[in-house]
Amino acid sequence: MRNTKKVIAAPAAVATLVGLAACGSSNDNGANKGDADKAELVFWGWDSGNSMKEILADFEKANPGITVKFNNTGTAEKTSTALSNAIAAGNGAPDVVMLEDPTVTQFAVTDGLVDLSEFGADKLADDFAAGPWNKLQYNNKPYALPIDSGPEMFFYNKAVFDKAGVDGESIKTWNDYYEAAKKIRATGSYITNLAGTSNDYQPFTAQIWQAGAQPWKVDGENITINMTKDEGMQRYIQFVQKLIDEDLVDAKTPNWSDDWNRELNDGTLASLTIGAWMPINLMTGAPDQAGNWRVAQLPQWEEGKEVSAEDGGSALAVTSQSKNQAAAYKLVEYMTHGEGAQTMADTGTFPSLKKILRSDSFTDPTTESNKKTNDYFGGQNVNEVLSAAAQRPTEKFQYLPYNPYAQTAYGDEVSKAYSGDITLEKALENYANKLAEQGKQQGYNVTVK
């Protein structure tokens, strides 16, 4: 039975999270749909675009019988921890919660979230980009709706590429990328960094996703881990090991470190494969390279293909503890599929809704925000490239129901391959064994191939 799974709560000593639980829904597990037009909702999330006040005011105006109390958790990690505590306690969860996409499965599998197909969300599938939509399914049912997305992109420094005699626009396949890496290394720069820390986990999942890998499969109580024999994983392992062996990547500098920003700013790192939300981070982290960076579609494993993958993204869900589920879903749909989605996009959130991605306003180079970004990217229409990527097809990809552990364990084990202690294949074998052990501790039947 699914309720045999352990819900691991974080230490209750974290005062801010205890406070959040106190501000959660006072309802117990006898949740029901409630009145769709009259409710007092509690909503946990973060507000990176500073748009929440406007969105919720507009929602309440359109739904005069519903009020929303927004508790700003500050970060995705704090939100997940607080929700874990509330589920473990059996009370205190909000009506609506914002989550990072990879964590949705862990809460769905423990019955912490509502299957949104009960409210017709499954009929919205074609309205969203495939990548973010596919990530939020559990047992082929939507347990959250995407509020933003992060299609994986190829960002490159044209000045560094030009110095190496490489045309960035000519890189269509990963073999092209490998050949470019050799030329760039000869100039003293690296084509990119790969350090294998926990900060590199999301790019790792995006890269294996695009390679068609299925390193783990979750089927109810059963988890199958196939970390090194899976065809897509072998494709990825052999390619990355070649980059490591030939010293073509900076294997010491982790993403988001001070050294990482310094190397992006001085040209040591010539490119990144990372989510579409990256432009603002380059603009602030590598100001000296203004005018030099460009963005292109992700290189492909097979020539002529147009397969994408997701790196990051967040979503809105309705909790099982809520007794206002119908009204809560109204808010979720408004923010992800209704007018609130446009407001989010207007304030800098990268959209997941196709109609916004295809809109003239999103790619209009004359808007203040777009002009600033395009100037940094040498006059390129950045959103036009990003929009095309978001609408590319993606393979289906699952996350483990204990994804936070998977991220930490990835850094513990895989970093050893980048430091040269062991091969990447051996590191991933060790990683698979740790994932299996954790799954068994949580009550799953785990098979390692």
Feature-to-residue mapping (PLM):
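Short, low-complexity disordered leader/linker segments with a strong preference
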Residues: 1-41, 61, 426, 433-449
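Short, well-ordered beta-strand elements
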Residues: 35-47, 66-71, 95-96, 143, ...
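Extracytoplasmic "Venus flytrap"/periplasmic binding protein-like
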Residues: 58-128, 163-165, 263, 267-271, ...
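A structural signal for short loop-to-beta-strand junctions that line the ligand-binding cleft
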Residues: 93-95, 124-160, 304-309, 392-400
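Hinge/lid segment of periplasmic solute-binding proteins
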Residues: 101-152, 178, 207-208, 294-296, ...
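Conserved C-terminal helix/tail region of periplasmic/extracytoplasmic solute-binding proteins
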Residues: 162, 386-449
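Glycine-centered hinge/linker elements that transmit conformational signals in sensory
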Residues: 181, 222-253, 298
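C-terminal lobe and pocket-closing loops
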Residues: 278-289, 302-408, 446-448
